[in-house]
Amino acid sequence: MRVVLLASAVLCLLAGQVLSICSPVDYTLYVEKPECDFCVAINTTICMGFCYSLDPNVVGPAVKRLVVQRGCTYQAVEYRTAELPGCPPHVDPRFSYPVALHCTCRACDPARDECTHRASADGDRCSKPLLLHMHAYPGQSNYIQTL
């Protein structure tokens, strides 16, 4: 009986690793600068998905070793640059944004990651007219950063 229980527990832990679905997904950023005339919709990818976590509801110093809290975060990122239209000559119209290339499940590191619990609901709104068709900045410099 104990062997069956132990085997079931091991299989559940392994299934949690296999079912950790963390991958790049399509996302639309709405970007505007106060000095420019338009809001721009930029299509990119972000890391999103499920990562295995374990947080036992038992209190004690030995339990801290059992806590596994990982989130879906960037493993490799490429930064791209877009040019925002309708900006006066004294304003830099360029905007750089991340594109997720590969994602991974790991504990959040505040020195490297943006560790937020909930995104703002206002992030998907524009206060200026929206332009839906955006072209990359002609002289854009893409660079890849592996985290």
From Swiss-Prot:
GO terms for molecular function: hormone activity. Pfam families: Cys_knot. Glycans are attached at N43. InterPro entries: Cystine-knot_cytokine, Glyco_hormone_CN, Gonadotropin_bsu, Gonadotropin_bsu_CS. One of its GO terms (biological process) is G protein-coupled receptor signaling pathway. It is found in: Secreted. GO terms for cellular component: cytoplasm; extracellular space. Keywords: Disulfide bond, Glycoprotein, Hormone, Secreted, Signal. SMART domains: GHB. The keyword Disulfide bond applies. Belongs to the glycoprotein hormones subunit beta family. Indispensable for the control of thyroid structure and metabolism. May play some role in the biological processes of the immature fishes. Heterodimer of a common alpha chain and a unique beta chain which confers biological specificity to thyrotropin, lutropin, follitropin and gonadotropin. This is Thyrotropin subunit beta. It comes from Anguilla anguilla.
